[in-house]
Regions:
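RecA-like P-loop NTPase motor core of helicase/translocase proteins
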Residues: 1-149
Length: 149
């Protein structure tokens, strides 16, 4: 990260990383899925916390207590929000504040240009909820998109 995290942000990153590792372990052992979420008050730096977490997952991370997690360069993240403007703001902040993400690793999913059957490994996809509604173009078949097998 290009910025130093405040102690409560560091703690949030570690707590989230532990929760994600536990969720992945539960999925692998039992096939059980679960949601891991970040909740914090306005101005607490949720985007910075999430950016540090994502950067740490891609590149590996260790903590002062000796806890360490291997890199997961093929992880896929979907950044979901209600508005395209908020997605753009979040994407720009992540690109500005992280130091280890590659150029092009952050991808905005738009109805006009997105044409993939599956998301590619190692990317952060920014998507707003309207695009995946029942009437959204991303959830319907068309003459140019048919990924049924």
């Amino acid at each position: 990260m290009k910025v130093d995290l405040i102690s409560f942000q560091d703690k949030a990153v570690k707590d989230l990383r532990v929760d994600i590792a536990d969720a992945l372990d539960n999925y692998r052992k039992r096939g059980k899925t679960q949601v891991v979420s970040l909740q914090a008050p306005t101005g607490a730096g949720k985007t910075i916390i999430a950016a540090a977490l994502i950067e740490g997952i891609y590149n590996g991370m260790s903590f002062p207590d000796g806890t360490a997690y291997a890199e997961q360069p093929d992880a896929i993240f979907v950044w979901l929000s209600d508005s395209p403007e908020l997605n753009l703001q979040s994407k720009e902040k992540i690109e500005l504040k992280t130091s280890k993400l590659r150029y092009g690793q952050c991808v905005t999913i738009s109805e006009e240009s997105f044409d993939m059957e599956m998301l590619e490994d190692g990317h952060i996809y920014f998507l707003n909820t309207q695009k995946i509604s029942r009437s959204g173009k991303l959830t319907t078949l068309s003459d140019t998109k048919d990924y049924r097998h």
